[in-house]
Design a protein with these regions (language model features):
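A conserved beta-strand element that flanks and buttresses the S-adenosyl-L-methionine
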Residues: 105
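Class I (Rossmann-like) S-adenosyl-L-methionine-dependent methyltransferase catalytic domain
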Residues: 1-45, 49-99, 115-196
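Residue-level marker of regulatory loop/turn positions in helix-turn-helix DNA-binding domains and
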Residues: 102
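Short catalytic micro-motifs in class I SAM-dependent methyltransferases
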Residues: 108, 112
């Protein structure tokens, strides 16, 4: 795999302060979700970046684990989450064991992956979430572009990736999409089916 997708690429972006995926806080849809979603136990934030969302999840009562394979992202997230109970670890999402999480939170992780890893991502989400567990967050929808990351994903492809193991519960426009994603960013919640 090209280092363009490896830790060194992301280290450089963090060192140079080029983080167009960083919302600088907790997005409105996640904040609203946390007010109406009962504590589902453990929450995972893959590709956690600065970690704002991990702190919000911990503050809402989740046992939040934020992971990133970039040491610079982990250092930044540890600073931002220092006053919360969130744990931040330098780990590769695809190397996680068979832990069960009640929630996997998505923002700017799937679109940072090479499109060839999308199926691996979907299988990992299904493996990490038991029946009733939820995959919730923001998805950059649109035709797959060759000049990413970020890589948009066609809505039909996302549905095909997740439909066997998940049922979509929510799908709506984002109140304040990140400029890098524009109006194609959607808030979605998917619940793990019990029959797969």
């Amino acid at each position: 795999m090209s280092d363009f997708y490896g830790p060194q690429h992301w280290e450089t972006l963090y060192r140079e302060g080029r983080m167009p995926w960083d919302a600088g806080g907790v997005p409105a849809e996640l904040a609203a979700y946390l007010t109406r979603q009962p504590n589902a136990g453990r929450a995972l934030v893959p590709g956690c970046g600065s970690g704002y969302e991990a702190a919000a999840l911990a503050d809402a009562g989740f046992d939040a684990l934020a992971i990133d394979f970039s040491a610079a992202a982990v250092a930044r997230a540890r600073e931002i989450t220092a006053d919360s109970r969130a744990r931040v670890e330098q780990l590769d999402f695809f190397e996680l064991g068979d832990d069960d999480f009640g929630l996997v939170y998505e923002r700017a992780f799937l679109c940072a992956l090479p499109p060839a890893r999308r199926e691996d991502w979907a299988h990992a989400c299904a493996r990490l979430l038991p029946a009733g567990g939820r995959l919730a967050g923001y998805f950059f929808l649109g035709p797959t572009n060759a000049d990413g990351p970020p890589f948009a994903i066609p809505p039909d492809e996302l549905k095909a990736l997740l439909d066997d193991a998940f049922e979509r519960l929510e799908d709506r426009p984002v109140e304040a999409p990140l400029p890098v994603f524009g109006e194609t960013e959607r808030w979605q919640v998917w619940q793990r089916r019990d029959d797969t």
